[in-house]
Regions:
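Aromatic-rich peripheral "rim/lid" segments of glycoside hydrolase catalytic domains that contact
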Residues: 25-120
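Glycoside hydrolase catalytic-domain groove-lining segments
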Residues: 1-26
């Protein structure tokens, strides 16, 4: 519905807050991200296709940046690292850590989308 409405009024959309837990729904930074990387790649492909065809999706914002944080408890407690996941959610649930393979994919997608938009 949002896509059709944005198309009707000629306004861009940003696909935001998409994310997926790490493989086996584990939260530590050493857990693999194969399934999440596939999901992110599919999302980036859609946004890149729309950008190239001057479609409505012109950007995206993943959820959530975990950086160098490391979950210390299942749910946030005073003194724990701040992560992208809110305190009422499992810490590390959707966090993209600075050491994840997902980072390179994000960098490539950002570069590709920027190049497409700059050529228009």
């Amino acid at each position: 519905m949002h896509v059709q409405e944005a198309f009707k009024i000629n306004k861009p959309l940003v696909l935001e807050e998409f994310g997926l837990p790490r493989d086996s729904v584990k939260f530590t930074s050493n857990t693999s991200t194969v399934q999440r990387d596939r999901y992110y790649r599919a999302v980036f492909d859609i946004v890149e296709k729309h950008a190239a065809e001057k479609g409505v999706f012109q950007g995206c914002n993943f959820w959530a940046w975990g950086g160098f944080a490391e979950p210390q408890h299942l749910f946030w407690q005073r003194g724990d690292d701040y992560m992208g996941d809110p305190g009422q959610e499992e810490q590390g649930l959707n966090s993209v850590y600075a050491t994840d393979s997902t980072i390179n994919m994000i960098k490539e997608a950002v570069s590709d989308i920027n190049q497409i938009i700059q050529k228009q």
